[in-house]
Amino acid sequence: MGQRIPVTLGNIAPLSLRPFQPGRIALVCEGGGQRGIFTAGVLDEFMRAQFNPFDLYLGTSAGAQNLSAFICNQPGYARKVIMRYTTKREFFDPLRFVRGGNLIDLDWLVEATASQMPLQMDTAARLFDSGKSFYMCACRQDDYAPNYFLPTKQNWLDVIRASSAIPGFYRSGVSLEGINYLDGGISDAIPVKEAARQGAKTLVVIRTVPSQMYYTPQWFKRMERWLGDSSLQPLVNLVQHHETSYRDIQQFIEKPPGKLRIFEIYPPKPLHSIALGSRVPALREDYKLGRLCGRYFLATVGKLLTEKAPLTRHLVPAVTPESIVIPPAPVANDTLVAEVSDAPQANDPTFNNEDLA
């Protein structure tokens, strides 16, 4: 059986880790709507420390959106999208939904962010040219099968919409190559199995709920309140499918197969924010919590993923040189020196001003 290492504030398990051979490393991000603000905080800490040892990236819904910003090396981008755009009435409007429209307007969100703060896809293209891969998960509307898309400049924004199209709330779904897709969280909210299938030996998983927490999705609870029982009937099979797949994924994380190693970064308690309709103060608190958890991960696990452990144990004493120079490890508190986009509208420079005390 593999190994699961929980990483959250107050958990000392990462402190006892010894050097190991990580092999192929994957970064996997869970969806969760506005709860993705926690993931944004974690990934902003990674970017601040220039920490990116990953070979493979997989995300669903909000996780795919967060990873898009990370892969394009745009610190503060995801935070800005969640706090300044998803809180606007143009995006989330219950009255529009009652009148027969969409509860969430993904088209407005994608078009507004693309025009006002575009993703730096050229940066991502260079990453892909180096051999790294990024997959976004969306669910087929006809049979609920999860599909994993490699984004390109041409389809990137459409795949984000497909991966985030919450059933019922974005009524039409998203058509890709003639097939309708819905939110990838229906079938694969945390694509850890796909990461393992693609050869990853070490998984870093960022959750948006406390570990081992089984829950009914927030969007379904809201739908229960806003719609009558008769209107919910067509979605019963979909919800049951989601709950079954989510439990299966959770069990996979708790008991990884073979020699798989899973580092699970998660909030120590339920977040203040919810999937939709969160208040800005709640989002701000959860972002800070994500930053702190990201910093804790870097201080405990990060160096083990960037340093190569010896393949064999030497039987003869190693010769120690007269002087040893040890470069300082990347520290999350250091000033950001990574090259980022020079387009001010594409980043959020205020992300670095958060009070983390």
Regions found by a protein language model. Name each.
Residues M1-L58, S68-A357:
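Patatin-like phospholipase
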Residues G59, G63:
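Gly/Ala-rich beta-loop-alpha elbow adjacent to hydrolase catalytic centers
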